[in-house]
Amino acid sequence: MFRSVCRISSRVAPSAYRTIMGRSVMSNTILAQRFYSANLSKDQVSQRVIDVIKAFDKNSPNIANKQISSDTQFHKDLGLDSLDTVELLVAIEEEFDIEIPDKVADELRSVGETVDYIASNPDAN
């Protein structure tokens, strides 16, 4: 009894599946291009980086009141050690939805250098 049901269902299922699914309109179209929004201005990038730095929880209370500019050094002015700098750069990566390569991250020492790198990255948004 079950043998006949399995035999019938195996013949009917593929044709029913084709009828239900049909051909997709997009199946012949290939979208092989990426769309970019307008690049961020340096002022926008700078303000967002400064906001991330001020919100960074490793900062001492003095940093929130301190004036942060493009000349601000992560180690000297903010007092961040290497691990804190990496955590800050990860927070900046998350803010702009980008990935900063390790070699580049090792060279970023100030807010200005970070802003320049992000502004030149077309994937930043």
Curated annotation (Swiss-Prot):
4'-phosphopantetheine is transferred from CoA to a specific serine of apo-ACP by acpS. This modification is essential for activity because fatty acids are bound in thioester linkage to the sulfhydryl of the prosthetic group. GO terms for molecular function: acyl binding; acyl carrier activity. GO terms for cellular component: iron-sulfur cluster assembly complex; mitochondrial [2Fe-2S] assembly complex; mitochondrion. The modification O-(pantetheine 4'-phosphoryl)serine is found at residue 82. Pathway: Lipid metabolism; fatty acid biosynthesis. The keyword Electron transport applies. GO terms for biological process: iron-sulfur cluster assembly; lipoate biosynthetic process. Keywords: Electron transport, Fatty acid biosynthesis, Fatty acid metabolism, Lipid biosynthesis, Lipid metabolism, Mitochondrion, Phosphopantetheine, Phosphoprotein, Respiratory chain, Transit peptide, Transport. Residues 43-122 form the Carrier domain. Residues 1-36 form a transit peptide. It is found in: Mitochondrion. InterPro entries: ACP, ACP-like_sf, PP-bd_ACP, Ppantetheine_attach_site. It comes from the Eukaryota. Complex I is composed of about 30 different subunits. Present with 60500 molecules/cell in log phase SD medium. Belongs to the acyl carrier protein (ACP) family. Carrier of the growing fatty acid chain in fatty acid biosynthesis. May be involved in the synthesis of very-long-chain fatty acids. Accessory and non-catalytic subunit of the mitochondrial membrane respiratory chain NADH dehydrogenase (Complex I), which functions in the transfer of electrons from NADH to the respiratory chain. This is Acyl carrier protein, mitochondrial.
